[in-house]
């Protein structure tokens, strides 16, 4: 919703779960809607995709966070195929951040925002974060991450989220300041 409120046009959507996709389409009305696994999207030949999807200003992705959530199974589910709620397809979820980076390599946006839970920075999951950095760097992007806390941003909940921000090497975003100091409105 933030992009919409900021006046951005939402051009496309890739979502495997029909119910989630329906809500997204109703909220954002993307010009191009791909109801499919992102792995299948990445297999579509570039010449079969709308040219508007290449060299975007911003590409945003939020790979499922259940495998990194401190409330979830974490390490026990890593690398295992399972029937998850998303699309009810048997799949692994812990590698979808890397699959999203393959999408970045395909579409070549100027800026990439990828969101996940704070748990991706904790314990053994830190290796996933390091690999995210390595993979972005290997396709010509510099990357940083910011931990944002909802209660400090005027959101009435204590949700902590990590935002990986990647840019092409010629894009200067090194001094981005995302510090918020709103009075918490949690109850």
Name these PLM-found stretches:
Residues 13, 35, 60, 113-114:
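Generic enzyme active-site microenvironment
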Residues 44-56, 66, 70-187:
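Class I S-adenosyl-L-methionine
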Residues 16-32, 58, 156-158, 162-168:
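Accessory recognition modules or surfaces
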Residues 1-42:
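SAM cofactor-binding core of SAM-dependent methyltransferases
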Residues 17, 37, 57-60, 94-95:
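Acidic side chains
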